[in-house]
Design a protein with these regions (language model features):
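Small/polar beta-strand repeat architecture
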Residues: 137-163, 169-226
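Long, contiguous amphipathic alpha-helices that act as assembly "spine/axial" helices in icosahedral shell
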Residues: 48, 73-133, 239-256, 291, ...
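Glycine-rich, mobile lid/loop segments that gate access to catalytic sites or pores
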Residues: 218-240, 248-261
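Generic alpha-helical secondary structure
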Residues: 102, 106, 161, 224-227, ...
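Short N-terminal amphipathic alpha-helices
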Residues: 46-48, 57-62
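Short helix/loop capping segments that flank catalytic or ligand/cofactor-binding pockets
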Residues: 56-59, 87, 259-262, 346
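Sequence/fold signature of self-assembling virion shell proteins
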Residues: 2-32, 40, 45-52, 72-79, ...
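Active-site-surrounding "flap" and adjacent substrate/cofactor-binding loops of secreted or lumenal enzymes
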Residues: 63-64, 69-72
Length: 362
């Protein structure tokens, strides 16, 4: 019976994962390009590898010197753990439920897991590259930036703690940086937009009186007459970052999704793809994005929605059942099922540019 219980537990895990993959949009918008084994004993670490850009050489027939491509490695920490633990009144009935992937038990377990992982992945809006956000920018006053420390001293500014994590760029900067800490209404600290190396600021000195931009500091309002323009802005962010045109996605809550369906410009694109909208909440295809509707998008209409767009290369996701079995209840008659699911996600620095965010409300 012990072996049978183990086999039933393994089948439960396999079928729940099948339902998870059928329903989770997280699986559709991420990749699993990692190396290593997930064991579940602790916070497992697997490696995410990526290569830097390659270059073409002019060939003249002479001997060539081989380039050394850069290989970047990030660690994905599988530190999210969720457990199933419930009593089994009848082992025979439980085994029957487990044998049928369409049973309410398996469907409920798989869909709950999908919602949980979707919420986790859609909460990674802080891993969007600085400069890839659409919202209401903050540009009031002027600033000076100190060399090395990245301390920003504002004049006529009203910085807030909510600005931490947003992109920052002052006149004189050649790229975007990220707000690291908030000190006061006139003082913040910025850093390079990197997570896989030690925090540093390499943007140099910016003299006082410089104009600047803090991207998407507050939410902006969208309507059916303006939503298409903001989608094109997201597309432009990815285009400028040279993100591949294929496998692009956009995830919106129903409030935004229904607004999109009212937009005159979007009706032809959505109608063309309407045959497949039931699968995983696919709303349609717009401006090169496969659009998903999902209520796990971070935020609400009061605080603002963190609508994410991107390419499958943006985020690496690992999900696994590491324990699954049936055991005798201690101190009582009967049995119980106990299973452990672990997951984690990582956006490595090289791929932050493959994500974009629209911070909005209706």
């Amino acid at each position: 019976m012990a072996d049978f219980g183990t086999n039933v537990g393994e089948k439960f895990a396999r079928n729940v994962l099948q339902v998870f993959f059928e329903n989770s949009i997280a699986d559709s918008i991420t990749n699993n390009d990692y190396e290593g084994e997930i064991k579940g004993g602790g916070a497992d670490r697997v490696n995410v590898l990526t290569f830097g850009s390659l270059s073409l050489k002019d060939y003249t027939g002479a001997a060539m010197t081989a380039d050394t491509p850069s290989e970047n490695e990030g660690q994905l920490i599988v530190n999210q753990k969720k457990a199933y633990y419930f009593k089994i009144e009848s082992f025979a009935k439980f085994a029957s439920y487990v044998d049928n992937p369409e049973s309410s038990l398996i469907q409920n377990a798989g869909k709950v897991l999908a919602e949980t992982v979707d919420k986790y992945v859609l909460g990674l809006y802080g891993d969007v590259a600085a400069g890839n956000r659409i919202g209401t920018d903050y540009v009031t006053g002027t600033v000076a930036v100190a060399t090395t420390t990245g301390v920003v001293t504002g004049t006529g500014t009203t910085f807030t703690s909510a600005m931490v994590g947003r992109g920052f760029k002052a006149t004189g900067h050649t790229k975007w940086y990220r707000i690291k800490t908030y000190t006061s209404a006139t003082s913040i600290t910025i850093e390079d937009d990197l997570d896989d190396v030690a925090s540093a600021y390499t943007g140099g000195d910016i003299a006082g009186g410089a104009s600047y931009t803090i991207e998407a500091a507050t939410k902006l309002q969208v309507a059916n007459t303006t939503i298409y323009g903001y989608l094109l802005d997201l597309k432009t962010k990815l285009d400028q970052a040279k993100v591949p045109m294929t496998d692009r996605w956009l995830v919106v809550p129903s409030k935004i999704g229904n607004l999109m369906l009212k937009a005159t410009e979007l009706i032809p694109a959505v109608s063309t793809a309407y045959e497949n909208v039931v699968t995983k909440g696919i709303l349609g295809y717009v401006s090169g994005f496969k659009v998903y509707q999902n209520e796990q998008v971070t935020g609400d209409n009061s605080a603002g929605y963190r609508v994410l767009a991107g390419h499958k290369s943006w985020c690496t996701l690992a999900v696994a059942f590491t324990e699954s079995g049936v055991e005798d209840l201690i101190g009582a008659f009967g049995k119980a099922y106990k299973g452990l699911t672990v997951y984690g996600a990582k956006v490595i620095d090289e791929r932050r540019k493959a994500g974009a965010e629209l911070f909005c409300y209706v």
